[in-house]
Amino acid sequence: MIQGALHCDDTQRTLEGIQSLGAKVQVKKTRTISSGIRRPTTSNRSIDCGESGATLRFLTAISSASLKTIRLSCSRRLANRPLEPLVKAINSLGASAHAISDARGLEVLVKGPLRGGEVTLWGDISSQFISGLLFAAPLAIRDVTIKAEGALESRPYVKMSIDVLKKHGISIEESNGKFRVPAPQEFVPASHKVPGDFSSAAFLIAATGTVGDEITISGLGPYEFEPDSAILKLAPEIGLEVQQNGNSLTIAKRELDGFQFDASNNPDLVPPLETIGCFADGSSEIRGVKRLVYKESNRLQTLPTELAKMGAKIHAEDDMIKIEGSRELVGSALDSHDDHRVAMACAAASLGARGESIIHNSEAVSKSYPKFFQDLARLGVQLSVE
């Protein structure tokens, strides 16, 4: 049973995907109940992952444990994001996987069994490749060892995956950048309470930084399980006062100061922090950003481009973003580039800008935070949706 599951486009794609693999799922108001299966099965239709990268990567890996061919598809936009390292890893572990690209998008064909062995993946492209293989590895014929080559970025998300697997009775050994999963193993049922989503809440925190009003956000704990709660440690340095009361946070703005932040483990914090940096006194630097080119849009280009329309001065080079703060932003016609986090960052910046802004393709927020604009309205923001 899962309590507090997020309902958005991405999680809906995952839900439909696991149902196609044979799981029985009941979705209720506050909880989701799933009856598992010993091994993924096939369906007569392709699993449509839409634009959900996590769904595509996780279910591609899990499908490698099926004894029948599983078909997965995704949008053309998602097809441009990395998948080949995962496909190669699945083949190296004895299963069969190949991807076919055309004008409509991408189709992936996967068939097990996953025989086991050792595979190496670069750790600086997507941690979801490693998480996906960890989900599949217990169903392999023999032990699986996954080695992360180079720096493993977004390591906290791999740890989160391991914690979930351990709750389901799966044994995993980690040493010197290697993850060894004895196989075969059997999953046991477990219950989960999903912590609040700091990746989304960070945009409300950014809104506080741009306009200065105090806000309270509830339902965010326990913080130690959410990697993007790292923004709480940075907040005092930026000039945001944070008071914690159980699972609630109250955020108030003081004088904003320029800051430095390493986003290697928290790439989703870059858009809200980039927005805050525009209003801070002095310059700010965000490092560890090279993977932003692989997101829903190339965020190394798209967000600086949109904020520049408002008067922001942002420079992206190599693995760093530099933001010149203390600049007055002016409302403008902006575009989300169909990227949910760019849309929310533009909205947060617009709150502190002089004049009105229009955000085209703002519906992109439904990918992760469908009620974002409703929540802004509850906070007193004047907005209209056309």
Language-model-detected regions and their locations in the chain:
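Short, structured segments at the rim of ligand-binding sites
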Residues: 1-386
